[in-house]
């Protein structure tokens, strides 16, 4: 089987206001691969994610994400890179005054979708993928935390991304719900979307083993 590299970082250093967070980071992720980014809170996992979606610049090294050269990336092109990425955070960031359907529609309109029939069809499709058929008319406060996280995953899948970046997506969920969400991410990767999954949850990691990068003492190593 031919492998397609979807994320490639070489000798990258990442700085935040506090100074250098990660040094000499080299990693590659293939199309459809599931990879853990494991590390304690504050170890630099989020900085790696932010570098990949071009929120934090590289201080040195080179990087290519979904065909975009991070070093040469112009500000005006960042939204085009991000359309190839789906980003899922620990906090759900749903609009509390809008239904699940309207939350997803809002994102679609913001990223250039105009055909209302296509919008409805696509939303129905992603809600089915994440196991939320029939929940489109519900308000966020009417569904559980696990279901809210499924909505954020549906939101991340809207534009058929090549990569999902999941930053502590199970941090606010109980163990059983976390396991369900993890199975969903694994299904997403099996369908051809790369998943980089940042977590400090060793229980989850031990239950669902996969290729692992560890963030510790300012470096990222494969374990």
Q: Which residues does each predicted region cover?
A:
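Short coil-to-helix segment of the ABC ATPase nucleotide-binding domain corresponding to the Q-loop/switch region
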Residues: 98-106
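ABC ATPase NBD coupling module
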Residues: 70-86, 188-190
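Conserved ABC transporter NBD signature motif
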Residues: 61-69
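Conserved signature/switch motifs of ABC ATPase nucleotide-binding domains
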Residues: 138-141, 159, 191
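Conserved ABC ATPase signature
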Residues: 139-143, 147-149
């Amino acid at each position: 089987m031919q492998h397609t590299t979807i994320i490639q970082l070489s000798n990258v250093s990442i700085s935040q206001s506090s100074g250098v967070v990660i040094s000499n980071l080299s990693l590659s992720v293939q199309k459809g691969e599931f990879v853990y980014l494991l590390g304690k809170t504050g170890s630099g996992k989020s900085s790696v994610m932010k570098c990949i979606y071009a929120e934090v610049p590289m201080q040195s090294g080179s990087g290519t994400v979904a065909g975009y050269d991070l070093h040469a990336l112009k500000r005006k092109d960042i939204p085009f890179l991000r359309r190839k990425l789906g980003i899922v955070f620990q906090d759900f960031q749903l609009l509390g005054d809008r239904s699940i359907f309207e939350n997803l529609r809002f994102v679609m309109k913001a990223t250039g979708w105009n055909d209302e029939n296509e919008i409805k069809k696509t939303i129905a499709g992603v809600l089915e993928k994440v196991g939320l058929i029939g929940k489109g008319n519900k308000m966020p406060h009417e569904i559980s935390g696990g279901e809210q996280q499924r909505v954020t995953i549906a939101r991340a899948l809207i534009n058929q991304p090549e990569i999902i970046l999941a930053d502590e997506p199970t941090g606010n969920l109980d163990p059983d719900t976390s396991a369900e969400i993890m199975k969903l991410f694994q299904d997403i990767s099996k369908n051809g979307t790369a998943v980089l999954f940042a977590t400090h949850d060793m229980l989850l990691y031990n239950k669902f083993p996969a290729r692992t990068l560890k963030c510790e003492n300012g470096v990222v190593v494969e374990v």
